Each structure stands twice: as C-alpha cells, then as structure tokens.
Amino acid sequence: MNKMLGYLKDYKRESVLAPLFKMLEATFDLFVPLVMADIVNIGIAAHDFHYILVRCGILLLLAMIGLACSLTAQYFSAKAAVGYSTALRHALFEHIQTLSFTEMDTLGTSTLITRMTSDVNQVQSGLNLFLRLFLRSPFVVIGAMVMAFTVNSRAALIFVVTIPLLSVVVFGIMAATRPLYKTVQNRLDRVLGLTRENLTGVRVVRAFDKEKSEVERFENANDLLTKMQLHVGHISALMNPLTYVLINIAIVVLLYVGSIEINVGGMASGDVIALVNYMNQILVELVKLANLIVQVSKALACAGRVQAVLDTTPGMAFPEKLLGEVPAEKSGDAVRFEHVSLTYAGAGAPSLSDISFTAKRGQTIGVIGGTGSGKSSLVNLIPRFYDATEGTVEIMGRDARNYPREELRGKAAMVMQKAQLFGGTIRSNLLWGNKNATDADLWAALETAQAAEFVKAKPLGLDEPVEQGGRNLSGGQKQRLTIARALVGKPQILILDDSASALDYATDAALRKALAALPGSLTVFIVSQRAASLQHADQILVLDDGHLVGIGTHDQLRQTCPVYEEIYESQFKKGDAQK
C-alpha cells in the first residue's frame, strides 16, 4: 500500500488540511450541548429572555463556523481524492501499456477495465470519506466523553462503558466483512467478463439461437454475485441496529442516573440534556464511523486489486539502444527463426515446436495451415509481441531482443486479423503509422492498399470521420485502411495476418501486385487460408499443429508436402484456388 499512497504526494497539503478542518468543526460541535445546558439551567430557569437570545446567537455562530469549516474540509478532501484517483488511473493505464501480450492474456480485458473504472472510483470514494471522517469521528467520540466528565463525572462513567462496547461491534463487523468484499469484486469481474463476451459476440449468439443459454449462464454468475452481496449486506446491516440498541440502553441508564442526580442536587436538568446530546453525538459519529469502515474496507479491497496490476512486472525488457553487430553472412537476412518454440503462459502444450527458416530481404513469405496450427503465433514473434520459449528470432541479422521497442516496431509492421480503427478521421488513423507523414505519403499508402478510390469518394476525403471501431465502414474498407496505416510507416517487414480475408480476389491480387512493386526490399509475410493468395510467394511455410511440415514454393510443396496438397486440392475443387 505504500506504493499506492505515493500518488498522494502532490496532495499532502490537502490531505492534512481536510481532516484538520473537520476536527475544527467537531470542536465547535462539542460546545453546542454546553450552550444548550446553559439556556435550560440559567435562561429558562430565570426567565431571562435576553440571556436566551445571546446563547441562541452563540449557537448560530457555532453553526456558521462549523459550516465554513465543513465546506473547506470538503473542498480539500475532494481535491485530494480526485487528484489521487486521476494520478492512479494515469499510472495504471501507463503501466498497462508496458505489459506484454502474455500479461494481458493472463489478466484479461474485462479485469483491466474493472480495475481502471470501478475499482479506482471505489478507492476515490473511500479516500474522500476517509479524509473527512477518520479524525473527526474518533475525536467527537472521545471529546464527547471528556466533555461529559466536565458535566458530571458519575454519569460520564456510562460513556466509559458504552464506547468500548460500541467499538467491539464496529470493528468486529469490519473484520468479518473485509475479506468478503474481495470475493464480491472477483464475482463482479466474472459478471463483467460474461457481459463483455456476450455483447462482443452478440451476432454469433443470435446466429446460433443461444440467447436462452446465454441468459442462463449470466443468471448463474449473477446469482453467485447477488448471494455474496446479500451475505456481506446482512453482516454489514447488523451495524446500525446493534449500535442503536447499545446507545439507547446507554441513554436509558443515563436518564435514570440523571434523575437521581437531579433529586439529590448533583446536577441540573440542562446537564442531563447536555449528556443526552453528547450520547446522540456519539451515536451519529459511530454510525458515520461504521459507514466509513465499510467504505474503507471496500476501497482497500479495490486498492489491493489495483496494486496487484501495478505489481505485475512486464515480462519483456527492451534495451534503450541497439545492441550487437550484424554478421556479414546474415546481412541479407530479414527474418531468421532458429529452433524456435513457443508455449503460452498457462498452456499445457506448445503452440510452436522447433521452427527454423530464413526469409531474405525483399522476399514474400506465405504462411498457411489449418485452424490452430500456429500461424498467428509464428508471426507474432517477429515484432516481439511474445518471446520465444526456446530458440532465437532474428530480425535483420540481430536477435529481436537486442532492439529497442520503437526501432523494432518501426522495422516490422503488423496488420492484425481483426481490423481495428479508432474514433477520429481517416487521416488520424493513418498517422498512427507515422505522425510526421505528409498527405502524399498517406495517399501513396492508400494507393498501395487499394483504398484510395473509396477514400476519394468520401465527401471529406482524408478528413472523413471514423466512428469508434470503424463502425461506419465495411469490413473490406477497414482492412484496407489498416494495411495502409502499416504502410505509412514504411517498414522493412510487413506482416499481413489474414488481414485481407474480406477482400475479393481481384482486390487481393491487386494488393499483392502493388506490394511487390514497392521500391526497396520490403519483406512481406502473408498469413492466409487461401492457397491462391500464396502460390506466387517466394517461400511458403506450411504449419500443422505447431510444427513446420513444409517449406518451399507452391510447385515444390505440391510435390513434397501432403498437408499443403490437401489444402490446395480442397480449395481447388471448390474453385477457390486459381493459377
């Protein structure tokens, strides 16, 4: 938690002033019962209207000062809490950006969203409440007991007995509920994960008529969450009735003792009123303290979960500068895999096993195989989204681990299977490839990606708005824009991970022809299910269950690789493969 508190360093002044002003407010509140006792004992007893007015004026003054102190404390506590949550959220988001795909896969998207939103908001609310009440409530409880001794020491002994009993109830319930709130948050994660999965795959759910089963699955998870929330709620709900019972018993005893003291002349009736007021103040503050403890318990549970993400160490380390020299015999290499294997975290079996091949600069490399054969896993190793479990991946003659992050990602641009665009304009999305690109660079990339025609047809051209996720564009348009975005950076290696699946054959062929015509020695990796898209590649890698079962040209593989021949024949018979 010390690391979490570090984000308060810019708000030390506010964190000190907020509780101090609340204590100042509480100090004035403690004088109110004494003034009321004077009104009863002196003003009313003597029928002194002037004295009553003066004391009422004092009460009004105390109320105004208390209000000013309360507003000031609220300002400082809100400023500290909001500033803290902003800094924490920024640090959390920044840390998430440093995590590798392995950590992202382990943590899960829905979990990270919960940490960034719900958990941080809960910590903010808990901190705001804590700064305002963590000193005020105990101060009023202790102060009321001390002030009671100034009124009547015998009656004040009731406070000495009552306060420890109340503390046992409050802190006992806090100890019982704190671990349960962690379980509640974990079950909330499950519900949010199911919600996200369902909304993301809503079309698949509709297509397979699985609405009822999805509702049942959600209800099961939601019922578990509800049961745990009710369990925690039932325990927390004991707080108020138990404290009220104890306070009311104490007031009854106080009235009994007070009546005896009045009869023997040990105290006046106004003093009894003051003592009852002090007891009520204790009740109010203990209820606040109970609520504070519940909220702080939730906040601490959430803070622990946020801390767990911040403590997640990135699995990859990138050097600050380029390391090593390129051997002369490897100067023509673009990508070299040497006995590479990959096993994902938590997976029982490797996704890739003993893969070795070399791609020369300027070559086009096709990657083909059945579903789950490891095609995406292979190309994900090139820009170092994952580190190989065994073996070495070399980029341009150097170990991929010797490249700084920016330089490696600048050399190897990847177009993912899912075409992901961001809210903004076509221009702003393309500039992700190179923020300094000119309009000429953008149009050149669009021409190569076969996207220039439809962009020119847009009323605003490059400045045409793009909705979040590219909802206002077709699948083919989104794929071509993501390819153009990668080309804007002018990479030395371009990876198309099944990113032309929404293109027709003519557009796909035109794209491959345009890529081949680019100046320089661009190395292209094309991952595809279509044999027709790969048959003109310089090399084709054939994967089967994580193993490289064939490597060569189209004609060579048809003669030597049964897996490739089976894929080709199955598509050729359907008319999907073309010469």
Show the residue positions of the predicted features.
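Membrane-integrated ABC transporters
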Residues: 1-31, 36, 44-60, 65, ...
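Extended non-transmembrane interhelical loops and adjacent amphipathic helices
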Residues: 1-9, 35-41, 45, 75-121, ...
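Transmembrane helices of ABC transporter permease
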Residues: 10, 14-27, 38, 59-62, ...
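An intracellular "coupling" helix at the cytosolic face of ABC transporter transmembrane type-1 domains
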Residues: 10-13, 98-102, 118-127, 131, ...
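Helix-loop-helix
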Residues: 48-54, 147-161, 231-305, 309-313
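Pre-NBD coupling/linker segments of ABC/ABC-like ATPases
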Residues: 314-330
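ABC-type nucleotide-binding domain
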Residues: 327-579
